[in-house]
């Protein structure tokens, strides 16, 4: 199947950033392409204004946080942020007043008294205008992340955004450009990079256990059919709508982030090209028909063009490594992110549980040997903060570790563990996979958001806490 110029512009956003009118609406973002010059991923160019790799903003003894989007993830984030030393929640915003009130309940116990904004789709902008906000923490629907992050940086705020950071290549480029021009951090909140086995395998890779890294695999296979077709779980069914008239890997970051760090993508290697293929939709359309037969509410979702059950994307890097990513949030399968690391000296695989390690073809190491490796390669961040993070919670503690390290870096004036180049690159897989699927699995060249700086950039993820690490969990 081939796409014409207009279709490509829709998927990549190269006809314009699509940043206007970014209110807190629950409706799905409709890209509004205009006729423009012919575009191809290989033609995408970013010219660096300032290298944000290793950038350390001035230290903030108290990090004043404005949270925008107080839904499922926003409330969970608030419950974690109030447990971190040096955090002050100064503003909350959501389209729905009841959501803001629920957010207020999350922080009131810890003596935070934030300003509240919920009187319209543009109210979130008032949070960005406030002088008592240092960090904007975004937990809004996907299509709002990039425009809100860009607006926040333009208003002198650091940004931490839920995943994905962007939906189009142009949004990715604009995020990078704005961060470079304003010298404001823009971090995508990829919590899996702080999960315990993922950090252990990163440490193992850095210390040479796997030898030369050859191949990695990641996935987001998580059955969300009932949640997507819920009347209440996602406001105005925004996540269901993201699955209509799109076909690709819509959520690659959970499987990709840790593998990208292990391969030093943006920091000594880079993605070269990607190919992607999707199955047909075997469930979302039929499920919509089944629901609509008994409830007129679901009739607008019948006969829609839903994305395929399974998407598989393969990436090749400049140094010849490969990555396989999968996305399926419909099929009745056990949860998996795979997390496979394959090198010339060893292999690790997290799913299906329990996690395993091997050093030859005869099989996985024994449980006893696994625990010996765990003791040897568990990084300092886990040893120092892991148990407290588990107590605070958030996907077993990784969410808390992520938030804790973000605040710790801001308080001590350190580079963040993940920067805007990571946010852009990992998010770019979404439009690139959509383009490749529509083109019959044709290769899509992956843009270099570092403008060549990847060859000299240094890895950021400080799992050994060589700097900072003194912020307390309360």
Show the residue positions of the predicted features:
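N-terminal glycine-/serine-/threonine-rich beta1-alpha1-beta2 phosphate-ribose binding loop
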Residues: 2-157, 173-185, 468
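C-terminal helical cap and adjacent loop that interface with cofactors, partners, or active-site loops
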Residues: 11-16, 33-36, 44-45, 75-76, ...
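Predominantly a Rossmann-like dinucleotide-binding segment in NAD(P)-dependent oxidoreductases
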Residues: 69, 182-187, 192-305
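ADP-ribose/adenylate-binding Rossmann-like module
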Residues: 156-168
């Amino acid at each position: 199947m081939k796409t014409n110029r207009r279709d490509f512009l829709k998927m990549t956003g190269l006809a314009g950033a699509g940043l206007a009118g970014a209110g807190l609406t629950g409706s799905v973002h409709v890209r509004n392409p205009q006729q423009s010059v012919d575009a191809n991923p290989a033609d995408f160019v970013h010219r660096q204004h300032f290298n944000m790799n290793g950038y350390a903003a001035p230290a903030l003894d108290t990090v004043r946080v404005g949270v925008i989007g107080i839904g499922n993830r926003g409330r969970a984030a608030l419950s974690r942020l109030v447990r971190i030393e040096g955090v002050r929640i100064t503003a909350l915003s959501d389209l729905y007043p009841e959501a803001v009130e629920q957010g207020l309940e999350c922080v009131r116990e810890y003596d935070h008294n934030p300003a509240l904004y919920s009187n319209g789709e543009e109210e979130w902008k008032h949070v960005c205008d406030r002088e008592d906000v240092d960090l904007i923490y975004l937990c809004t629907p996907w299509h709002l992340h990039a425009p809100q992050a860009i607006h926040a940086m333009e208003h002198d705020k650091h940004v931490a955004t839920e995943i994905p950071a962007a939906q189009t290549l142009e949004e990715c480029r604009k995020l990078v450009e704005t961060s470079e021009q304003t010298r404001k951090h823009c971090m995508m909140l990829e919590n899996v990079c702080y999960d315990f086995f993922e950090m252990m395998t990163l440490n193992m890779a850095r210390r040479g256990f796997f030898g030369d890294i050859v191949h990695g695999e990641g996935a987001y296979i998580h059955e969300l059919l009932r949640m997507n077709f819920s009347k209440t779980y996602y406001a105005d069914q925004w996540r269901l709508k993201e699955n209509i008239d799109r076909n690709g890997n819509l959520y690659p970051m959970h499987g990709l982030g840790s593998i990208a760090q292990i391969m030093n993508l943006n920091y000594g290697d880079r993605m070269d090209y990607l190919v992607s293929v999707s199955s047909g939709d075997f469930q979302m359309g039929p499920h919509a028909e089944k629901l609509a037969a008994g409830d007129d509410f679901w009739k607008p979702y019948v006969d829609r063009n839903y994305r395929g059950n399974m998407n598989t994307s393969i990436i090749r890097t400049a140094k010849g490594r490969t990555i396989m990513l999968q996305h399926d949030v419909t099929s009745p399968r056990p949860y998996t992110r795979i997390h496979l690391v394959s090198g010339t000296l060893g292999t690790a695989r997290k799913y299906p549980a329990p996690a395993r390690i091997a050093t030859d073809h005869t099989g996985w190491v024994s449980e006893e040997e696994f625990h010996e490796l765990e003791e040897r390669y568990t990084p300092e961040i886990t040893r120092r903060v892991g148990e407290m993070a588990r107590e605070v919670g958030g996907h077993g503690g990784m969410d808390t570790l992520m938030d804790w390290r973000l605040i710790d870096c801001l308080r001590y004036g350190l580079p963040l563990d993940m920067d805007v180049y990571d946010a852009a690159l990992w998010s770019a897989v979404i439009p690139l996979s959509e383009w490749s699927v529509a083109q019959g699995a044709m290769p899509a060249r992956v843009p270099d958001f570092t403008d060549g700086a990847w060859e000299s950039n240094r890895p950021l993820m400080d799992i050994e806490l060589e700097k900072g690490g003194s912020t307390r969990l309360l």
